[in-house]
A protein has these predicted regions:
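Active-site region of glycoside hydrolase catalytic domains
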Residues: 1-192
């Protein structure tokens, strides 16, 4: 399965422990370095509904929820309302310790950083995962030799979406092209378009 989570309780429980470890690290770091800002890096792939069909729109919305599952917990300090539906879908029950909710709330991250390489389209027939995204083609975009779309609008879309969601600083830490790197004017033009 391309979905790293599937119905494996061990994976889901490990993800919860990752959230707790991150929050505890943030709490400790603030004691040691009160002015420090801590964050995490997320692979953030912009996506569009494959068509305007309502079922494609619903599939797209579900995938956006999956995309933000990790950052919602780590930047907001609590599980989003849709988390329980994921757990039900995968037939898992997360075991939480008595003070886990307080730890998550106290240890929220200060910024969102992300990598962004390609956009995709999401349709009703695509297999949705927590980690893996389908690689749907967008007929409105040119592609690299690897078949990755060149989509400078998507970086703006992600910046707006993430800021609207968290109202915290954002850092773009990777914005690749998806082909063999070699200095040429085409790469510079694509970079300029993204800026």
């Amino acid at each position: 399965s391309s979905d790293v989570c599937s119905s494996d309780l061990t994976t889901w429980q490990a993800i919860h422990h990752l959230f707790i470890a991150s929050a505890r690290a943030k709490i400790l770091a603030k004691k040691i370095m009160p002015k420090a800002m801590l964050g995490a890096m997320y692979a953030t792939s912009p996506s569009y509904p494959k068509t305007c069909h309502p079922d494609d729109q619903l599939a797209w919305m579900k995938q956006r929820r999956r995309l933000f599952y990790f950052s919602d917990v780590m930047l907001r300090g609590y599980y989003p309302s849709f988390a329980r539906s994921f757990w039900d879908e995968y037939k898992v029950t997360i075991r939480m310790e008595e003070n886990d909710e307080e730890i998550l709330k106290e240890g929220t991250l200060d910024f969102y950083s992300f990598s962004c390489y390609r956009s995709t389209t999401i349709g009703k027939d695509d297999k949705l995962g927590i980690i893996a995204l389908p690689f749907g083609e967008n007929p409105y975009l040119k592609s690299t030799p690897w078949g990755w779309p060149i989509d400078p609008v998507s970086i703006r879309y992600v910046l707006n979406e993430v800021y609207d969601r968290y109202q915290k600083p954002i850092f773009i830490v990777e914005n690749g092209l998806g082909e063999v790197d070699k200095p040429d004017e085409n790469n510079f033009e694509i970079g300029r378009a993204h800026v």
